[in-house]
Structure formats: structure tokens, C-alpha cells
A protein has these predicted regions:
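C-terminal cap/substrate-recognition subdomain and adjoining C-terminal extension
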Residues: 76-84, 88-95, 100-241
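Alpha-helical substrate-recognition element adjacent to the catalytic core
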Residues: 1-125, 130
């Protein structure tokens, strides 16, 4: 018996958006209007690339960024939940699928000593250039019309499950924990014995609810959470079964 836990990162594991939090490093703690207004829907990663250039141009160094990022608060109950998962790793495989980037997620998980809880992190690759600028790239290319062009979480999940099957690993149940609009595509891929756990009051919960109202509900079970303690209670029930 093994369960797969799939986590989003921003507004799920942490209680903020890591990409907008980095703006605290700018000289005025805000971006100039021209840069802020340059975002085009579906092209967030390119926008963040421009933000990182602006930070570099203003002399913001790696250590300052790291200090700022590691002050992001975890979502209520999340520290307890990740501790619980860490104590039961023989039953839980755990992955992150996120539109953030490798540098931010790595900093935050390592600072809190949670990096060993997660088996894999799927997110946009980022690195510091020789001149000290943070650069970010698209995670992959895909053909899904519903998702931003740099990341389709359904594709990531499907490829991960296929790879695990090749290794002889299959899961009793998939538990998908997220909050955003880009979490709907993978949730619609889940089967009836899986469970989606959307965060209360966020886009994913609203979109799942709209599907149910239009009589095309998702196949999986749905359990809304407001604190990660709700998620932990559910996982404890799973282990009792």
C-alpha cells in the first residue's frame, strides 16, 4: 500500500506567492509600473525573467534574495503535516509540481529542513549566471490549451506515474493538494478513487465547484482544506484503513 501526495507550492505549502515575495528585495519594495504592466496572461515565466533582470540591475545579490525568501511563512498546519509525512515516508511518495522555480523552492525547503520529505520537485529550472543574475527557464513544452505555456501539471503527473509504473511502483490513491487555476488540469486527470484537496476560498475550489454546477464534475473525491491539519487528519484516516 503506497500513496502519492502531489503538492502545489505557492499558497499551498507556503502561504504566499514566492514570485511576488521576491519584490521585497527591490529598492522601493515594489516594481516600476512599466515592468509590472508588462505581464501577459499565460507568460508568467517570461515576466519573472524580466523581474530578475531588474533585481540584478539594482545590485540585489543572491544572499539577500535567499534571506528574503526564507522568511516566507508556511501555510497554517503545514509544518506539522510535512513532519507527519516525513515520519511515514514508507507509505507516502511525495512530489511538488509548481510554477515557481528550483532556486526558490530549494532555499525554502532546505531552510526548514523539509527537502527530504519530497521525492521529486517539478518546477521551472532557475540558476544564477556568472554575473550574479537569477535566470529562469520553462519547465517543458506541451500542447495543452488549458495551461500556461511553460507548464502543464497534468502532463507532469502523467509522465511521473508512467515512469513509476516502469519501476514497478503503483499507488493505492493519489492525493492532490493545491489552490490555483493551473491545478484544475491535473485534478481532471484523477480517477474516482483518488482525491483532490483544494484550498478553501481559492481558485481551484471555485473551478471544481463550477464544474459540479454545470453537471460535469471531476471524477475524483473532493475534500476542501483551510489548514494543513485538515489534510493530516485525512492522511491519518487513510493509514487506519
Amino acid at each position: 500500500m503506497k500513496f502519492l501526495l502531489v503538492f502545489d507550492f505557492d499558497h499551498t505549502i507556503i502561504d504566499e506567492n514566492s514570485d511576488t515575495w521576491i519584490v521585497k528585495c527591490t529598492p522601493e519594495r515594489k516594481l516600476p509600473n512599466g515592468l509590472r504592466n508588462s505581464y501577459q496572461p499565460g507568460h508568467w515565466t517570461e515576466y519573472m525573467g524580466r523581474v530578475f533582470v531588474y533585481l540584478g540591475d539594482n545590485g540585489v545579490k543572491e544572499d539577500e534574495m535567499k534571506r528574503t525568501m526564507t522568511t516566507i511563512p508556511f501555510t497554517a498546519g503545514m509544518i506539522d503535516l510535512l513532519g507527519f509525512i516525513g515520519e511515514n515516508k514508507e507509505l507516502f511518495d511525495c512530489i511538488i509540481v509548481s510554477d515557481s522555480n528550483t532556486v526558490f523552492i530549494d532555499w525554502i525547503l532546505k531552510a526548514a529542513d523539509f527537502h527530504k520529505v519530497f521525492d521529486e520537485v517539478f518546477t521551472n529550472p532557475a540558476a544564477f549566471s556568472s554575473t550574479g543574475y537569477l535566470t529562469v527557464q520553462h519547465f517543458h513544452a506541451h500542447h495543452c490549451a488549458k495551461c500556461p505555456k511553460n507548464l502543464c501539471k497534468r502532463k507532469v503527473l502523467k509522465e511521473f506515474l508512467d515512469k513509476q509504473l516502469e519501476r514497478g511502483v503503483s499507488y493505492t490513491q493519489i492525493v492532490y493538494i493545491g489552490d490555483g487555476g493551473n491545478d484544475l488540469c491535473p485534478v481532471m486527470f484523477l480517477k474516482k478513487n483518488d482525491i483532490a484537496m483544494p484550498r478553501q476560498g481559492y481558485t481551484l475550489e471555485k473551478k471544481i465547484s463550477q464544474l459540479a454546477q454545470s453537471l460535469s464534475p471531476v471524477q475524483c473525491s473532493v475534500l476542501v482544506w483551510s489548514s494543513a491539519i485538515d489534510i493530516m487528519s485525512y492522511l491519518k484516516l487513510l493509514l487506519k484503513e
